[in-house]
Design a protein with these regions (language model features):
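A nucleotide-sugar donor-handling region in carbohydrate enzymes
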Residues: 71-158, 174-183
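Structural motif
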Residues: 33-34, 53, 138, 240, ...
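Structural alpha-beta junctions
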Residues: 50-54, 79, 94-104, 161-170, ...
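Conserved beta-strand scaffold positions in the cores of enzyme catalytic domains, especially
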Residues: 54, 104-107, 224-227
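Donor-nucleotide binding loops and adjacent catalytic segments primarily
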Residues: 130-243
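Short boundary motifs at domain starts and secondary-structure transition points
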Residues: 25-27, 65-66, 127-133, 215-216
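Active-site and donor-binding regions of nucleotide-sugar-utilizing enzymes
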Residues: 1-101
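Short glycine-/small-residue-rich Rossmann-like dinucleotide-binding loops
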Residues: 40, 144, 246
C-alpha cells in the first residue's frame, strides 16, 4: 500500500465501515460535547456514535480519501490541499467527482508544534549565528507514517554527502519506527556509514543529543540516524530535533 492506495475513495469506504467498531468509546459521552480527531478513525467513530460536533484535523497536505470522515468538519492546512479535498482530486482515478460541501472544509493554516514555537526567537538567533560563523548547515529528514519516502531521502543524502564531508552540512535522519528504511539507505549509499552515528531505540540518548545540539559550544557534524521501536518516541523525536536544525 502506498499514497495512491490511501488516496482512493474505495479505501476510505472500508475504513468508515471499520470505524463503527470504535463507536462504543463515545457511548457515555454527552453527544453535544465537541470532538477533535487528530486522526481520521476517532473522527469517523465519533460520527458513528452520534456526536454532533466533530472536527477532523487533517495532518497531511497530500489530499487522500484516507482522511475523509463524512459528517465532520475537515480542517486543512494549505490552499492546494484545500482545493484537492474540495474536488476529491484523483480519489476516483480519472473520474470527475462531485465536490465536498463547502461547509465541511475549513482552511485553518499550518499546525506548528509547541516545541518549535516556544523557543523560536532564541533558536532562530542561533541559526543566524551558525550561518555567520560558517558552521555546518543542519538538515532534518523525517519519515512519514507510512514509511514511504526512502527514495526521496536517498536522493537528498547523495546530494548532501560532499557537503557533509566538507563539514558544510550536517544531517539528522529520523526514520521513525521504520528501521528497514535506515538499513535500505545504508545498503544503497554505503559511503554514508563512515559519517553516521546511530541513535537507536535509546530515548535517553536521543534526549541528550537534542539538548546537546542546542548548546552553541557543541559541534554537530556528520549524519545522525534516529530509530525508535516505541511509536511515541519515534514521532516525538522529530519535535526535539526541530529546534536545533536549520532546514
Amino acid at each position: 500500500m502506498n499514497y495512491e492506495g490511501f488516496r482512493a475513495l474505495s479505501y476510505n469506504a472500508a475504513d468508515q465501515k471499520n470505524a463503527e467498531l470504535m463507536a462504543p468509546v463515545y457511548r457515555n459521552v454527552p453527544k453535544d460535547i465537541p470532538v477533535i480527531g487528530t486522526h481520521v478513525w476517532p473522527a469517523q467513530a465519533a460520527i458513528h456514535a452520534g456526536m454532533k460536533y466533530v472536527v477532523n484535523a487533517i495532518p497531511d497536505n497530500w489530499p487522500m480519501a484516507l482522511h475523509l470522515s463524512e459528517g465532520s468538519v475537515h480542517t486543512i492546512q494549505c490552499h492546494n490541499s484545500y482545493m484537492g479535498y474540495r474536488i476529491l482530486n484523483g480519489m476516483n482515478k480519472e473520474k470527475v467527482n462531485r465536490p465536498m460541501p463547502a461547509d465541511s472544509l475549513v482552511y485553518t493554516g499550518h499546525y506548528i508544534d509547541h516545541e518549535l514555537v516556544q523557543g523560536i526567537e532564541a533558536d532562530c538567533a542561533a541559526r543566524i549565528r551558525r550561518k555567520e560563523n560558517g558552521k555546518p548547515m543542519r538538515f532534518l529528514l523525517t519519515i512519514g507514517g507510512a514509511g514511504a519516502q526512502k527514495e526521496i531521502f536517498a536522493a537528498i543524502i547523495k546530494y548532501l554527502l560532499p557537503y557533509i564531508e566538507k563539514k558544510q552540512a550536517a544531517l539528522y535522519v529520523n526514520v521513525g519506527d521504520y528501521k528497514n528504511v535506515w538499513d535500505a539507505l545504508i545498503a544503497e549509499i554505503p559511503e554514508m556509514k563512515k559519517y553516521a552515528t546511530e541513535h537507536f531505540d535509546n530515548w535517553t540518548d536521543t534526549e541528550e543529543f537534542a539538548k546537546k545540539a542546542l548548546d552553541e559550544k557543541e559541534e554537530i557534524e556528520g549524519i545522525h540516524g534516529f530509530w525508535h521501536k516505541n511509536i511515541f518516541e519515534a514521532v516525538y523525536c522529530t519535535n526535539l530535533l526541530m529546534r536545533s536544525c536549520d532546514v
